[in-house]
C-alpha cells in the first residue's frame, strides 16, 4: 500500500495500554487503538495521557492507527536557576 492512501488525523491520547499501544479519541469523536511508529520508538519519544498526536489510518481498517507525531504544548517555562544533575 502506498503512503498516499493513508488518512492523516489528529487525536488525543485517553489511555496507555501495554506493548506501547494507546487508546486515542479523534477530533470527530471516533475512538481507536494506536501504536507508536518505529522512529518514535527508536528516538525514545514518550507519549502520555492527554497528549495531542497525529495518526495515520488505513482506509481499510479505521479501528487501528499509527502515531507518527506528538504535538508539544507549552507546559511551562523551565526554571533557569534550577541546578542540573551531573553524572
From Swiss-Prot:
Superkingdom, taxonomy of origin: Bacteria
The UniProt record lists the keyword Cytoplasm: yes
Keyword entries, A-Z: Cytoplasm, Initiation factor, Protein biosynthesis, RNA-binding, rRNA-binding
Residue ranges of domain S1-like in the record: 1-72
Subcellular location(s) of the protein: Cytoplasm
Purpose of the protein: One of the essential components for the initiation of protein synthesis. Stabilizes the binding of IF-2 and IF-3 on the 30S subunit to which N-formylmethionyl-tRNA(fMet) subsequently binds. Helps modulate mRNA selection, yielding the 30S pre-initiation complex (PIC). Upon addition of the 50S ribosomal subunit IF-1, IF-2 and IF-3 are released leaving the mature 70S translation initiation complex.
HAMAP family: IF_1
Subunit record text: Component of the 30S ribosomal translation pre-initiation complex which assembles on the 30S ribosome in the order IF-2 and IF-3, IF-1 and N-formylmethionyl-tRNA(fMet); mRNA recruitment can occur at any time during PIC assembly.
Protein name: Translation initiation factor IF-1 2
Organism: Dechloromonas aromatica (strain RCB)
Amino acid at each position: 500500500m502506498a503512503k498516499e492512501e493513508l488518512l492523516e488525523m489528529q487525536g488525543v491520547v485517553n489511555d496507555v495500554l501495554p506493548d506501547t499501544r494507546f487508546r486515542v479519541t479523534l477530533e470527530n469523536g471516533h475512538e481507536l487503538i494506536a501504536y507508536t511508529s518505529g522512529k518514535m520508538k527508536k528516538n525514545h519519544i514518550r507519549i502520555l495521557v492527554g497528549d495531542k498526536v497525529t495518526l495515520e489510518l488505513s482506509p481499510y481498517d479505521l479501528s487501528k492507527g499509527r502515531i507518527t507525531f506528538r504535538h508539544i504544548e507549552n507546559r511551562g517555562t523551565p526554571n533557569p536557576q534550577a541546578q542540573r544533575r551531573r553524572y
